[in-house]
């Protein structure tokens, strides 16, 4: 083989190695957000004619003024309270019911269900049937106009479980499931 041919072999091998992953992505390597892989906060994910968007997940402290509106009772020692603020909008042309089953899972498969909130909590997510183009929270409501722009699910976690990341919110409705990775 000529000497110049030996110099081209490593260049061609490197080019092929770099091009291979691009070919895999182009051939259906893309995953479905919320179904195959957890969706990131801020993305609208459709399920059963309803778009679900998790806007923000944050620790709540009822001793500070902004959080007093969200929750009145402090977390017990060794635990923390987190609010998951979300929006659910009917994008179909028919009435649709919103999800009522929510679970947060950590990377150790520990599962946490939402804490009950008082009926008069203006930020509480309450599942219901929505007309076309209607949302939870309702347009013009305190929850929709507030800094989080969403209705709240309240979760109580043992402090050590907040380190078992990623934490994922699973939303289930009529046998369908969507998952969001929580940014905490």
Regions from the PLM with identified roles:
Residues 2-3, 23, 27-184:
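Conserved functional micro-motifs across diverse proteins
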Residues 1-25:
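Sec-dependent bacterial lipoprotein signal peptides
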């Amino acid at each position: 083989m000529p000497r110049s041919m030996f110099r081209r072999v490593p260049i061609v091998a490197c080019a092929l190695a770099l091009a291979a992953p691009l070919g895999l992505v182009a051939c259906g390597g893309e995953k479905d957000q919320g179904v195959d892989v957890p969706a990131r906060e801020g993305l609208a994910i459709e399920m059963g004619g309803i778009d679900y968007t998790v806007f923000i997940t944050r620790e709540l402290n009822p001793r500070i003024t902004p959080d007093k509106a969200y929750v009145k009772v402090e977390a017990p020692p060794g635990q923390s309270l987190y609010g998951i603020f979300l929006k659910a909008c009917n994008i179909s042309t028919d009435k649709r019911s919103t999800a009522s089953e929510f679970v947060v899972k950590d990377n150790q498969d520990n599962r946490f269900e939402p804490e009950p909130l008082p009926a008069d909590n203006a930020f509480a997510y309450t599942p219901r049937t929505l007309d076309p183009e209607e949302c939870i929270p309702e347009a013009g409501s305190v929850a929709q106009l507030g800094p989080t722009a969403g209705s709240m699910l309240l979760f109580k976690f043992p402090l050590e479980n907040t380190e078992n990341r990623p934490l994922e919110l699973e939303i289930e409705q009529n046998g369908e499931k969507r998952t969001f990775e929580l940014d905490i």
